[in-house]
């Protein structure tokens, strides 16, 4: 029997449909409904939000399928779920369950410290994290249909997401300004597929959407990432670790949409209650940096 796989065009088109929106982490049906009512374009079903994964330590794996099914049955918007880096079987299970997207995620403990999944071998589209253009293009080369900054998940600290978005966009501008005979050296230096380097020069942008993720905790954080060129925003711990999740969720959705309306963002930020408690990056041990979990 011939194996069916989704084409890049179809997968990327599905991801494009989420552009300009907010995708929220949820751990049960109740949270999923709050996210949908607030205007989220999709939800990420998982067992624990990144801040809880960070606090618990140990090995973080794919969520219990019961949780994923519960979320899928609760909402009409697309449902994503996380698989460990390189864990073929977790990804196949999620695909068989009918999730709309799989996030091959560094938030979970990698199953393979050398190889990522060959995402082009799946029908379901994948989202992956990146810190620079080399990581971005390697993931696209493997078949990712959507990218996100890695940031530093579960910290409530936006600084790493800002760094990664600026790095990727700066390197895109660098490639766009190269002459054709410089592109092969660029591919070597970035550790990226040559054909994708050429495509970036032609397009002047990535061939897939790139969302902001990792540390978004306030409406202003979401608006900042959109101003820096993000195509949308993932919010992990920032919603349901806040004092008022429903109000925070709605405010972040509106700030993402109207990210240059600073008066509105100021109003949205009033009387929200306390955001999630943040972590200063200098206080993280090297082994606790989730963003370093990939190649």
From Swiss-Prot:
Known EC number: 4.3.3.6
Record-listed D-ribose 5-phosphate binding positions: 25, 154, 215, 236-237
Entry keyword set: Lyase, Pyridoxal phosphate, Schiff base
Active site: 82 (schiff-base intermediate with d-ribose 5-phosphate)
InterPro entries registered for this protein in UniProt: Aldolase_TIM, PdxS/SNZ, PdxS/SNZ_N, RibuloseP-bd_barrel
PANTHER family according to UniProt: PYRIDOXAL 5'-PHOSPHATE SYNTHASE SUBUNIT SNZ1-RELATED (PTHR31829:SF0)
Function as written in the Swiss-Prot or TrEMBL entry: Catalyzes the formation of pyridoxal 5'-phosphate from ribose 5-phosphate (RBP), glyceraldehyde 3-phosphate (G3P) and ammonia. The ammonia is provided by the PdxT subunit. Can also use ribulose 5-phosphate and dihydroxyacetone phosphate as substrates, resulting from enzyme-catalyzed isomerization of RBP and G3P, respectively.
Protein name: Pyridoxal 5'-phosphate synthase subunit PdxS
């Amino acid at each position: 029997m011939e194996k069916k796989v989704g084409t890049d065009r179809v997968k990327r088109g599905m991801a494009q449909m989420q552009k300009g929106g907010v995708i929220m982490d949820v751990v049960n049906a109740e949270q999923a409904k709050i996210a949908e009512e607030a205007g989220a374009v999709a939800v990420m079903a998982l067992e624990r939000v990144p801040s809880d994964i960070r606090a618990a330590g140990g090995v973080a794996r794919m969520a219990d399928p019961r949780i994923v099914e519960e979320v899928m049955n609760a909402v009409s918007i697309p449902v994503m779920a996380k698989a460990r880096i390189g864990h073929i079987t977790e990804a196949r299970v999620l695909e068989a369950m009918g999730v709309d997207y799989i996030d091959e995620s560094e938030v979970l403990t990698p199953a393979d410290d050398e190889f990522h999944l060959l995402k082009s071998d799946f029908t379901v589209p994948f989202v992956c994290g990146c810190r620079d253009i080399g990581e971005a293009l390697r993931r696209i080369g493997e078949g990712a249909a959507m990218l996100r900054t890695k940031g530093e998940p579960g910290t409530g600290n936006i600084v790493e997401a800002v760094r990664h978005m600026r790095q990727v966009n700066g390197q895109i501008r660098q490639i766009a300004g190269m002459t054709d005979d410089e592109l092969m050296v660029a591919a070597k230096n970035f550790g990226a597929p040559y054909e994708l380097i050429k495509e970036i020069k032609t397009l002047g942008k990535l061939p897939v959407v790139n969302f902001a993720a990792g540390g978004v905790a306030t409406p202003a954080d979401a608006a900042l990432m959109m101003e820096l060129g993000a195509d949308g925003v993932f919010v992990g711990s920032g919603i349901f670790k806040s004092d008022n999740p429903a109000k925070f969720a709605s405010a972040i959705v509106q700030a993402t949409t109207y990210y240059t309306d600073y008066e509105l963002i100021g109003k949205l930020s009033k009387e929200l209650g306390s955001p999630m408690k943040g972590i200063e990056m200098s206080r993280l041990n090297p082994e606790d940096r989730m963003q370093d979990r990939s190649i």
